[in-house]
Design a protein with these regions (language model features):
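Short, mixed-charge low-complexity intrinsically disordered segments
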Residues: 2-6, 13, 62-89
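Charged, low-complexity intrinsically disordered regulatory segments in eukaryotic signaling
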Residues: 2-27
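Short aromatic-glycine-(Arg/Gly/Cys) micro-motifs in beta-strand/loop hairpins
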Residues: 20-41
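Short, contiguous acidic and Ser/Thr-rich linear segments
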Residues: 41-48
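A short, charged, amphipathic alpha-helix used as a generic interaction element across diverse proteins
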Residues: 48-69
Length: 89
């Protein structure tokens, strides 16, 4: 028996919306971090945690975040410009 408000696409839609909200909030973090990687270079991204900074840098570099876990995350100067949130997701 299915709930009254259940439809086949509701779980996928709910998950997509949750992922989009998490991504939006990750990019709105007030902190700044410089993420450096030997193969991809360096980028300044919003920073709520080191993992969030790596996730944001992976989006900018268009790579899987698991492949850049060896990246270094450093505190960035507040005057440095932050990379824009990519639209390609």
């Amino acid at each position: 028996m299915k709930p009254f408000n259940f439809n086949e696409g509701s779980r996928e839609q709910t998950r997509r919306e949750a992922v989009a909200r998490a991504r939006f909030h990750r990019w709105q973090a007030p902190g700044r971090a410089r993420v450096e990687h030997p193969a991809h270079g360096s980028v300044v991204v919003p920073h709520a945690s080191n993992l969030a900074a790596i996730l944001n840098a992976a989006e900018v570099w268009r790579c899987n975040w698991v492949t850049i876990l060896d990246a270094k995350v450093w505190a960035a100067d507040p005057s440095e410009p932050v990379a824009k949130m990519p639209l390609h997701i």
